[in-house]
């Protein structure tokens, strides 16, 4: 018997490990450099508009447990997405707000950064790989109906569910506790 889960990007308290929001907070929001709004092609139309539907790690864990107890899930593939489709820009703006920062954002051609990643992604400090850029531009969205079917209310990607970032050892010491 099997059930396959296909979650969108997962966020939530990583308990000392790296996850989606923690990595973005450390590598992009915490960086003195402007945040990249990637775009395909040669002109910056649509920079940062590709969408993701972040899903909370505890919602994913609840889905696993519920599926083990629900025979109707056997032999199914269940997409797990958060309650909202958010653009890359919206995600970065949310993370900046949680950090208590205003972050400059600039259009960056995906082709250029992909070429740089070919040469630099083998270095640990290079913040993004070619595969990550490709996945971001393709988007990673699904709705929360998989969670709803399992009786789980999806948590939004918002300040109240990102407060763990304020306690993270991965980011700047200046993150504010009052991001809500």
Question: How would you name each of these model-derived features?
Answer:
Residues 2, 21, 133, 157-158:
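A generic alpha-helix preference that emphasizes hydrophobic side chains
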Residues 1-93, 97:
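Oxidoreductase cofactor-interface core, primarily capturing Rossmann-like NAD(P)-dependent enzymes
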Residues 19-53, 102-140:
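Alpha-helical membrane-targeting segments
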Residues 61-128, 141-180:
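Mid/C-terminal beta-alpha module of Rossmann-like enzyme folds, strongest
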């Amino acid at each position: 018997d099997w059930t396959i889960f296909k979650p969108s990007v997962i966020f939530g308290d990583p308990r000392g490990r790296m996850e989606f929001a923690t990595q973005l907070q450390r590598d992009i929001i915490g960086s003195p450099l402007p945040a990249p709004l990637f775009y395909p092609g040669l002109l910056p139309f649509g920079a940062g508009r590709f969408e993701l539907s972040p899903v909370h790690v505890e919602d994913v864990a609840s889905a696993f447990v519920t599926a083990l107890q629900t025979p109707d899930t056997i032999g199914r593939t269940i997409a797990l997405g958060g309650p909202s489709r958010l653009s890359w820009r919206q995600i970065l703006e949310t993370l900046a707000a949680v950090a208590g920062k205003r972050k400059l954002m600039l259009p960056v051609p995906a082709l250029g950064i992909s070429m740089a990643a070919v040469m630099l992604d083998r270095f640990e400090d290079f913040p993004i790989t070619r595969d990550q850029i490709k996945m971001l531009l393709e988007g990673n969205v699904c709705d929360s109906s998989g969670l709803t079917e399992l009786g789980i209310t999806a948590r939004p990607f918002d300040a109240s569910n990102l407060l763990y970032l304020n306690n993270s050892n991965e980011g700047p010491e200046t993150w504010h506790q009052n991001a809500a």
